[in-house]
């Protein structure tokens, strides 16, 4: 089947036309100018009232259609940025190059990069609803927030007092969600000393790739491998059998992504007295790890190869300190939800490892659907204090607690029988809306961006059509709400 690079002939046509258009505009998180200017121009071209605030949020207002003037307004919300990750060896500049999207069968995906379905499909849905002349709906307060994937600067600085709605529909989730995790992002900074590579020792490069990666909240229950933790295990196995110097190490932050993504790649350069002996130990360790993850990570690749190095190694003490941190920092699923089955309770993700000239950074994302994340963060701080390294709090984001009236929930259950309500494992901006707009009824109704935050990300055309049509039906039913 030939690839459809322009997404033509897909339904709903307006959705895929919009999705293709925004995929041509670089919109990496932290680079909001282009996409927000495009949204403003789009609104102007269609006679829609819209403005952009200082945080680069775009707020658009669509009047109620005839007969819906007395219905409560509805907030529709998506975010305009995307996580930008590319495969090893792919030539792509996210600051200027369009995403090379294509459709094949029931799938829309991208060549060699993240697709941006998270949350481009939500943006495309909203653009289509705003311009549908046949639709029937209450007044729509449409919010496109900026920088959701990193700082959530848009959600933090949005003026919530401007909204009149009693109902809110988020289009940045997976299925029918009624709650989500809160989040704490932290950075661990360790000073790094220098020591010359010992005379006669040879350098080896360790490289881990081929992992799924993905979203550290929504994919936590899958218990995928974290490349940073695998690298730690390789080095620990080597240390038990021999000695080595650690020259540099890095992991995660593929394409600029932060610790919210599970690290899909990691690498290190080490110096050893006997390369053959070290390669033997590392090969055995690699086979052990591949066997452990043979089902969850069938494409895992662990390569060890000779290399040249012209820089100093870490001191032996700093090497041990870093190994202690990589080993002891909590990573992976911590607990499951006490009410909803197969739902995240709490998780911690060591998502970034970066050895720089004078320091080493480890970035950690901690999530929970209750208050357990605060205790997990206390654990991290006390561990780092014991080891004598610095911790920095990057941000703290609220959870989204269940807030749906019985009447609306009954309507939604009947409309979405294939999608039972559940809690999102990820952290979104919904908690800002529900905590700052008293009495707001909030749900998330969105097709799945499968494998988001990875280069395997894709959308199902069938599922997108289902959710788009159901949302149009829902808005029409809200005449008397």
Q: What kind of region is each of these model predictions?
A:
Residues 137-227, 235, 239:
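Fold-level recognition of mixed alpha/beta catalytic cores in primary-metabolism enzymes, strongest
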Residues 7-15, 338-341, 345-361, 365, ...:
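Zn-dependent metallopeptidase/amidohydrolase metal-coordination segment
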Residues 221, 227, 259-332, 336:
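A conserved active-site cap/scaffold subdomain adjacent to cofactor or substrate pockets
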Residues 20-24, 255, 268-269, 301-313, ...:
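A short beta-alpha structural unit
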Residues 2-106:
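Acidic/His- and Gly-rich active-site-bordering loop/insert found
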Residues 68-166, 203, 316-319, 331-337, ...:
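Active-site metal-coordination/substrate-binding segment of hydrolases
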Residues 224-241, 274-278, 320-327, 334-338, ...:
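His/Asp/Glu-rich mid-to-C-terminal helical/loop segments that flank catalytic regions of hydrolases
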Residues 219, 228-248, 394-440:
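Active-site-adjacent substrate-binding region
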